[in-house]
Amino acid sequence: MKTLAPAVLPTYARTDVTFVSGEGCWLVDDAGQRYLDFGGGIAVVSLGHCHPAPLAAAQAQLERVWHTSNLYWTTPMAELAERLSERFGGARAFFCNSGAEAIEAAIKYARKATGKPGVVALEGSFHGRTVGALSVTGQPAKRTAFEPLLDGVAFARPNDVESLRAAATAETGLILLEPILGEGGVVPLDTAFLAAAEALSRELGALLCLDEIQTGVGRTGTFFAYEQLGVEPDLVTLAKGLANGLPIGALLVADSAPEGFAPGDHGSTFGGNPVVCAAASAVCDAIDEELLVNVRARGEQLRAGLPNKVRGGGLLLGLELYRSAAEVVDECRESGLIVLSAGETVLRLAPPLTVTEAEVDLALSILQEVLG
């Protein structure tokens, strides 16, 4: 594919591997080499590559209608909204195409609902690369070249309640948190910090938004990660694993949250696409207790077999290394295992939720050989 590289803007430092097919937890490149995928397209391929349920749902919808615009209803969009509402206590959904768009929607919703433009987010967080999402991303290396960004954004240290309270003001309308900071090193937020964030949001009249773009849809062993954390958010953002690799994002607004959007306040040409929503409903239906038991069991199996300090939850795990994570990623790939980095010295594992005990054993054997 290097011959085609001049036609593509260099926004990614792509590895010189071209994948041509996949099934379950496995990928195949154009030379016929098989790879065990423990990156899952960066926590996207929740049910594994070419899973028959979303595949059949998308194929069936392709034979009916592809696009109508959001001036009209489609059954797949309404059915997906209902499924997510059932999971999140009567929530209402806005659909878009990516996690960054879902974050943009959350920022706008909070501004309109509270009348306050300020946002508190976390140092080390990652919420997307559009201007609004980048404004609330706590990684200076990603922000600096594009400043000035949105005003009124303050960053607190993760799991530091005093820092959180110091960052907030009377103009704070949104507190935005990832239950596990994925790109920021797979750092879980503790329950005391989350409880303090929820209490602070109520005190300020702000909305609490949990960015579950990476942790949601069963990734940590429950459909939403917040279910394990004793907190009730006003807003939740989803994307990544919701449609098993087809482009989708969602903002979920709790039934108890104040009114924000009215017709004309926000929109998305392709949001709620019927083909993608049909696939996403199939994914939601597949995230049952049996699958969640597998997520928890395989996560514990990985933890037990990894040699270094491990953090995270379910099948979103970070392994602290004593050398370059990028080098370990390369060495694992050369040995037939796809993994991810999350910072300079953290290895990130996010395999499909359907991964088997035998596949975890194989991944562990490769990791142990690479790490020594």
Regions inferred by a protein language model and the residue ranges of each:
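Conserved N-terminal phosphate-binding loop of PLP-dependent enzymes in the Aspartate aminotransferase
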Residues: 1-372
